[in-house]
């Protein structure tokens, strides 16, 4: 007879983890899941092991809405090593080419300007995008290069921070799907010297407050503190979570009266006043505005359910 599967807590929310360098995003996710004893967990856009910074971890029902964070913009601080190109476009790869750094300040400014605004980017072979059902980095590790189509991205802001010796520091505010490693590699080619990432930190995701980020070390300290005080760790850990609907905070809210929300939660589209004419909406119910799921305005102007919160018994 197989063992019954161990079930974690029904804890719902988003932890803004400050990921440390050298750890994979999945390792970070599993550690947070264990600390919170959560029944489900997922992250919203991986960070390379070399990178640090904001990694939103969705727990419980929040995992249903993590996809909306994947569509959000992000901000990074990056330091590039000029004069060296690597196979992965970062310091974890092998140096494949070395060239002298000879560009002028004017040439640097002109090159940076070509990366601002709406541009197209060919993803790195060392990415998790798939080709014929297989991740690109799996091909790359076998020495195989496959065709990749250029994808549209937007660089809302590209700030020059400093250029000292063979180091170049930038801050980049960009749209979903932007590979900072690829920007640095492409920039190095424009400058004629090659470049790769030696430091990368994700400063922000969507509108999440930076001051709410916490490290794994801090979470462990809270668990120890709870043990010393003889209280459940959840009393110290759970207040760190952002609301479960925070991944969808950019979408308008439609509040349903309780008489309508019961139909919505049973999978039926409902009519209500004050709804937008089209698009996705966050749906709440009652006077307290309890979040019950995501809806979409259908062709008849009704709010149709798309993703619903499952209410577990206490």
Curated annotation (Swiss-Prot):
Catalysed reactions, semicolon-separated: uridine(55) in tRNA = pseudouridine(55) in tRNA
Taxonomic superkingdom: Bacteria
Gene Ontology annotations of biological process type: mRNA pseudouridine synthesis; tRNA pseudouridine synthesis
Pfam families, sorted: TruB-C_2, TruB_C_2, TruB_N
Family to which the UniProt record says this protein belongs: Belongs to the pseudouridine synthase TruB family. Type 1 subfamily.
Function according to Swiss-Prot or TrEMBL: Responsible for synthesis of pseudouridine from uracil-55 in the psi GC loop of transfer RNAs.
Protein name per UniProt: tRNA pseudouridine synthase B
Species name: Escherichia coli O139:H28 (strain E24377A / ETEC)
């Amino acid at each position: 007879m197989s063992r019954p599967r161990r079930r974690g807590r029904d804890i719902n929310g988003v932890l803004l983890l400050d990921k440390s360098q050298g750890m994979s995003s999945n390792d970070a996710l599993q550690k947070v899941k264990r600390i919170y004893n959560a029944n489900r967990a997922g992250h919203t856009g991986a960070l390379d092991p070399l990178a640090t910074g904001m990694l939103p971890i969705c727990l419980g029902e929040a995992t249903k809405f993590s996809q909306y964070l994947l569509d959000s913009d992000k901000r990074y601080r990056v330091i590039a090593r000029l004069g060296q190109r690597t196979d992965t476009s970062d310091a974890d790869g092998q140096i494949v080419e070395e060239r002298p750094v000879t560009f002028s300040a004017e040439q640097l400014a002109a090159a940076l300007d070509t990366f601002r605004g709406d541009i197209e980017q060919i993803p790195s072979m060392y990415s998790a995008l798939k080709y014929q059902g297989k991740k690109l980095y799996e091909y790359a590790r076998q020495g195989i290069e496959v065709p990749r189509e250029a994808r549209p991205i937007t660089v809302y802001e590209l700030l020059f921070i400093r250029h000292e010796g063979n180091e170049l520091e930038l801050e980049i505010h960009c749209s979903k799907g932007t590979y900072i490693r690829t920007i640095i590699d492409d920039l190095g080619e424009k400058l004629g010297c090659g470049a790769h990432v030696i430091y990368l930190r994700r400063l922000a995701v969507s509108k999440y407050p930076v001051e709410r980020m916490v490290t794994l070390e801090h979470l462990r300290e809270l668990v120890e503190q709870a043990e010393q005080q003889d209280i459940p760790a959840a009393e110290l850990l759970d207040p760190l979570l952002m609301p479960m609907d925070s991944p969808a905070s950019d979408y308008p809210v439609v509040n349903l009266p309780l008489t309508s929300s019961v139909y919505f939660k049973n999978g039926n589209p409902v009519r209500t006043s004050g709804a937008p004419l089209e698009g996705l909406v966050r749906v709440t119910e009652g006077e307290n505005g309890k979040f019950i799921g995501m809806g979409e305005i259908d062709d008849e102007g009704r709010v149709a359910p798309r993703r619903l919160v499952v209410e577990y018994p206490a």
